[in-house]
Amino acid sequence: MNEWMKKGPLEWQDYTYKAVSVTASDKEYKGWVLTTDPVSANIVLVNFLEDGSMSVTGIMGHAVQTVEIVNEGDHSVREKLMHLFMSGDCKAYSPEDLEKRKNSLKKWLEKNHIPITEQRDSRKTLCVAGVLTIDPPYGPENCNSSNEIILSRVQDLIQGHLEASQ
């Protein structure tokens, strides 16, 4: 087993958003690490091309011989990599906007007699009746629950709130 495969997901995570040189199957690959698969140790490298496009390369974890960090990167590269695969309608919210959205949704759900609280460990996550959570930016797609009926009803309420507030 090679050195790369002996590492674990937490160690692989240290390479994320950094420029690396990877040797795999006696070939050398260079690029920015977008992610590493925690099961297979596969590496996804991104290279920004001069024409403004990018190339994405997947390297199989079992073939990796060495990985060397060549550049730690900076905040702008990290932001660019983080937003590569976000849809165009995805927008960033300021902390103030998120707080307004959270409070507005919380009032709306209370008005509709839905028991809503803020989770103790994360003041950003809303919790409905202890069985559903709503994460920022507090849209229907940000709801999580194993109870499909409650999930569907709360998502419908949130959608109605968004439509009413536009």
UniProtKB/Swiss-Prot annotation:
Assembly with partners or alone: Part of the core SMN complex that contains SMN1, GEMIN2/SIP1, DDX20/GEMIN3, GEMIN4, GEMIN5, GEMIN6, GEMIN7, GEMIN8 and STRAP/UNRIP. Part of the SMN-Sm complex that contains SMN1, GEMIN2/SIP1, DDX20/GEMIN3, GEMIN4, GEMIN5, GEMIN6, GEMIN7, GEMIN8, STRAP/UNRIP and the Sm proteins SNRPB, SNRPD1, SNRPD2, SNRPD3, SNRPE, SNRPF and SNRPG. Interacts with GEMIN7; the interaction is direct. Interacts with GEMIN8; the interaction is direct. Interacts with SNRPB, SNRPD2, SNRPD3 and SNRPE; the interaction is direct.
Keywords: Cytoplasm, mRNA processing, mRNA splicing, Nucleus, Phosphoprotein
Molecular function via GO: RNA binding
PROSITE patterns registered for this protein in UniProt: AD, SM
The UniProt record lists the keyword Nucleus: yes
Protein name: Gem-associated protein 6
CDD domains: Gemin6 (cd11676)
Keyword Iron-sulfur: no
Signal peptide positions on this chain: none
Residue ranges constituting the Sm domain according to the UniProt record: 4-73
Residues with Phosphoserine modification: S94, S165
Gene Ontology CC annotations of this record: cytosol; Gemini of Cajal bodies; SMN complex; SMN-Sm protein complex
Domain of life: Eukaryota
Domain AD: 68-166
GO biological process: spliceosomal complex assembly; spliceosomal snRNP assembly
